[in-house]
Structure formats: structure tokens, C-alpha cells
Amino acid sequence: MRKELSKVCGTTGVIVSAHTSLCVDPIQTYGTPEQKAKYLPDLASGRKLGAFGLTEPGAGTDAQGQQTKAVLDGDEWVLNGTKIFITNGKEADVYVVIAVTGKIEKRGRVQKEISAFNVKKSTPGFTFGTKEKKMGIRGSATYELIFTDCRIPKENLLGKKGEGFKIAMHTLDGGRIGIAAQALGIAEGALERTIEYVKERKQFGRAIGQFQNTQFQLADMATKVQAAQMMVYRAAVAKATQKDYGFEAAMAKLYAAEVAMEVTTKAVQLHGGYGYIREYDVERMMRDAKITEIYEGTSEVQRMVISANLLK
């Protein structure tokens, strides 16, 4: 579904992906029966929208660099901190938020204890800051989340105390498949529009699709899109059938994102001057494609995940 949505609109694809992969999935996987009954019916039906709060000004790729804190005070957790670049920010009703809840010793080193929480939009002390002006996916809301003595019930802890990092990594693994599907959809959409264009556009007395240079570029684009599709589907099957699918998810996300960027760039080039104006979709698709190489872990992070799996 996310792929098909993204063939037409990458923004719609990421709104759905953030909702399902980053909010619904962790609640479904780690939530208590009470939490599932409270949140999932409205989230699954679409009556409410979900989001995921992990990234901070000083903690992007380094998820252990979290500064947002949650302190237990009686029967409530008190949250203080800031999250940035949050997809569906302000528009979402339910947020899965990652925060530091203490310190633990692991392998002889003192590390931050990280936990996950469910936070409703209407909670006092939870506000929204800057709305980002983005290069692409402009139709999606990307906001700063601000927690100032934000009190939530003790039972809003998602999973166990200290499981936040595991929950975040699990969530990102699933999210990467969603972004890979988004990237694949953008690439497919750009390829389809380019094929239509080169059949109609005439130069030197014939359609530009009759020139061998154009044909070879289309062949390369189509081959890479097909290869990306196989990787995305393989990762999706792995998620559905096995516990550990991070390796496949990282490869699918890396390859599909880089293919999307390459295919949309070539699509703009093959459209010539028309590819640079808003009348044609490919300029938007190229801008939308770029973010797929960045969010849910940059291409460099995916290479780190892949190599770590190969060498473990």
C-alpha cells in the first residue's frame, strides 16, 4: 500500500508509514492488553493518527545520545525535553516517545537507561515548536515536540523500564521497510511518467524515446527499480515470518533509497527543461526521494547495520 501511495504522492506514503510502522507497531508489539485496547482501535481505524518521538537536536544517528528525561513521581512519569523532525507532529493524536529514565551498568560501562512511553496530544505540558520548511515531502507535518513537566500516568510506560532502546531499534527496523517501500513507489512513479513523456516528446523529427541513449537510460532505471522491488518484498516477507529482519530491512532501505534518488534524477534529466518546473511531477519526486536516504537511518547507518551483521 505504501509503495502504491508513494507512486503518486511520497508525502502520503510517509504519513501512513510513520503512523503504522512507528506508532501502531510498537504498541502492538510491546503494549499491555490495556494499552492495546486503549489506543489500537482508533489508530487502526484511522480515527486517530500516530507518531514517534526519537530524534533530538543532539541525538540523530546516535540514539543513545537522548537528553529527554522521564522521572517517576508517585503514580506519574514527568517528561522534560525536546524532539525534532517528527513526522506527523502536531497532527498526530498519539505519540510513542523515547526518554532517559536513569543509568545502568552494562559491560563495565555506565550507560543511559532508555524507556518508551505513550503520550497523548492533549496532555498538559506537551506542546509543539517549530514547523520545519522542507525540501521535499512538504505536505507532511514535521514538528518539534516540547515536553515541559509533562505528566503522564505510570501505566503509559510502553514495555518494561529500560527497554526503550530495544523498542526504538525494533521500531526503526520496521520503519525502514516502510521507507524502502516509499522510495520504491517514488522510483516507480518517476519511471512511469518518464516512459510516457519520452513517447510523446519529439525532437529532431522523432520521439526522444527512439534515441538509443534514452532507451539505455530507461533500461537501467527499470532494472534497478525491479531489483529494489525484490529487496523490499524480501524484507517485508522476513518481517512477517521471522523475529530478526534488521539485516534485510537495512539492505532494502539502502538500495531502494539510492535507486529512488538515481531514478528521479534521471527522470528530471530526460524531461529536460520541463523536468525542472512544477507542471511535471518528476521535480517533486526528486525532492521527495532525497529524504529516503536520510530518515529512519541514513544510507551510511544502513551500511553500518549491514556490515555489523556480516561480521558478527
Set out the residue ranges of the language-model regions.
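Short, surface-exposed charged micro-motifs
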Residues: 67-69
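Flexible, glycine-rich active-site loops centered on histidine and acidic residues
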Residues: 24-30, 52, 64
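Flexible, small-/acidic-enriched active-site or ligand-binding loops
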Residues: 65, 122-151
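Short Gly/Pro-enriched turn/cap motifs at secondary-structure boundaries
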Residues: 58-61, 85-88, 107-109, 134-141
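Alpha-helical interface subdomain recognition
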Residues: 1-18, 30-35, 42-46, 60-63, ...
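Short Ser/Thr-interspersed hydrophobic loop/turn segments at strand-loop and sheet-helix junctions
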Residues: 2-6, 99-100, 119-124, 148-152
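A short core secondary-structure module
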Residues: 75-76, 80-128
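A short, Trp-centered hydrophobic/proline-enriched beta-strand micro-motif
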Residues: 46-54, 98
